[in-house]
Amino acid sequence: MHINEFAGLLIPSGTPYDPRFNESDGAMTMAKWQRAAAAAVIALAAISTAVASHAAAEAASGPAGKPVNKPTGAPIQLALIEGMSGPFANAGAAVERNLRFGVEQVNAQGGVKLADGTHPFELVVLDSKGSTEEALVQLRAAADRHIGYIMQGNSSAVAAALIGAIDKQNSREPGNRELFLNYSADDPALTNADCSFWHFRFDAHAGMRMDALGDVIQRDKSVKKVYLLNQDYSFGHDVSSLARSTLATKRPDITVVGDEFHAIGRVKDFAPYIAKIRASGADAVITGNWGNDLTLLVKAAREQGLDTKFYTFYGNSLGAPAALGDAGVKHVIAVADWHPNAGGAPSDAWYAAFRARFPQAQDDYPVLRMPLMIETLAAAMNRAGSADPTAVAKALEGIKFDNGFHASWMRAEDHQLIQPLYVMEMDKAGTPGVKFDNEGSGYGFRTVLALPAERTVPPTVCRMKRP
């Protein structure tokens, strides 16, 4: 697996966004943040212009340095099919913000350059209500509107259903084809045994994430017993099996003392699960939980005083740090393609621009791969000189994209994006390596392991059928 005015920002006291926060402690005052954000927008514009110019040159477009004009062609619609209501509405809203940010960045740079002129992107949001059946209904609605680009990611089960339907759609109606852009559905099968020419994944799959977590667990000798707790659907089962195989390879001395699944989106009180974890004597929990299933889990752990480490896929997001508070300090580890404290001026500038666009504390969940997906799509269209899904799919294969601080490339063999990964540890904002906090909580994450893209390349068994 979740606005525009600083004057409207609700600022929790004692956080880096609090005007009273001591700047000497290493965090940012509000005045300093506003100045930095304004400067960062200018810096990000320069970075984006350079990237856009490079992509345009690659596609034999107009000369670099020419003033950017507003795109005048018909909008190219991108359909987001996601749960915008229901138990994971917060995750859906976070996705929409990140994708909208990417769309706005592309449009601000003149849109995409096709043979008939420049075209803006337009984000069309379709609510799947967290249901596979409703997602398929919305997919049909998108096809009826001849929307050629489908984006989804907050469920691997939904993603698999959409890919199957798109495969059939594209075979039956070659004049109305659709391309599926996946930003978070992390079931490894989607770029392995079940790979499809019409599917591109822009997130590291569960195996890639678990391998990175495994590198950190390997050197954490305090961990002797591990409890596996995951959501009861394809992704959760993948996390469980991958955790077992990774531990067997990297830490065969660790004992798995529990391996449990719970209904996705239905558990309101995780106290019984916390009691089981405590009784097992586990030193650490490995979980792929996301959204409210993660927030409620870590909240229960805090309330029950559970003193174990949480090795998570998404522990840095959507309310989890605030729910844990001090109990999470040096106890919660997460893995992601990027995080605000990754460091470096270009990274800081991008983050400041995102916060300037979405300054509310609860909106502080930037997911770099989502805007990056939009920008990479634009670069592929520029390369193809077309918005036809088939031509764009071919242009996406092997494409390299560098926004100035996060270089990535799309492997043609299985349509898996290869990019850096970061493993991070929760701590208080203002401590070394934690310049920024998450969602105004006063807690953020520091990098404990940074893997360059070449260290994250997974094997694949994909045997793709091409049109």
State each model region's role.
Residues 196, 298-372, 381-387, 437-466:
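Extracellular/periplasmic periplasmic-binding protein-like sensory domains
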Residues 62-102, 127-132, 155, 229-238, ...:
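Extracytoplasmic "Venus flytrap"
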